[in-house]
């Protein structure tokens, strides 16, 4: 999924493709300040772009930008890193794009006016070192940007129905975070 549309005068995307959600945000802003807004959300089966996400949140009123980049690491999440990882697969529920947009809108609803958010998550097969998620928040001040970006990533990981299967160099594989 891509967002090939042009931006309007507010910098929000026009003509967003399916799975991309733009323009969601919080309620009324204070005088002279626009409410927080989600400017890009997407699930993609193709490599992610840092530049796309950073460009999406670029605004004259943004003085601080926080960026989170999640990459595929070469070991599992166990404390001892017992398994060497060769890659992983991300699978998404059919509602995942909608839930991603809802989560981002909720986070924007709690962010200071003028804050902008963007998040793109990868699906499909990824090799070690590839980008799995790129999230960013821009705000007038760095503290709000850091806090909003952290909350966005935490909420995406907790609530968006995306599942990860790790593949190990020994040929085995396992689902991560699945409970029976």
What are these regions (language model features)?
Residues 132-139:
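Short glycine-rich or small-residue beta-strand-to-loop segments that form or flank ligand, phosphate
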């Amino acid at each position: 999924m891509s967002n090939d549309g042009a931006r309007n005068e507010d910098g929000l995307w026009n003509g967003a493709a399916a799975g991309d959600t733009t323009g969601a945000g919080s309620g009324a802003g204070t005088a002279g300040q626009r409410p927080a807004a989600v400017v890009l959300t997407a699930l993609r089966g193709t490599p992610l772009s840092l530049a796309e996400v950073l460009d999406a949140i670029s605004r004259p009123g943004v003085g601080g930008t926080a960026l989170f980049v999640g990459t595929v690491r070469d070991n599992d999440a166990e404390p001892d890193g017992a398994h060497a990882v060769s890659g992983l697969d991300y699978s998404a529920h059919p509602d995942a794009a909608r839930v991603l947009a809802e989560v981002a809108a909720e986070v924007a609803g709690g962010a200071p006016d003028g804050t902008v958010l963007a998040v793109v998550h990868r699906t499909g097969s990824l090799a070690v070192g590839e980008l799995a998620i790129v999230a960013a928040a821009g705000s007038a001040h760095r503290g709000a940007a850091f806090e909003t970006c952290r909350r966005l990533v935490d909420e995406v990981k907790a609530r968006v129905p995306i599942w990860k299967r790790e593949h190990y160099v020994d040929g085995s594989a396992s689902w991560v975070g699945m409970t029976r």
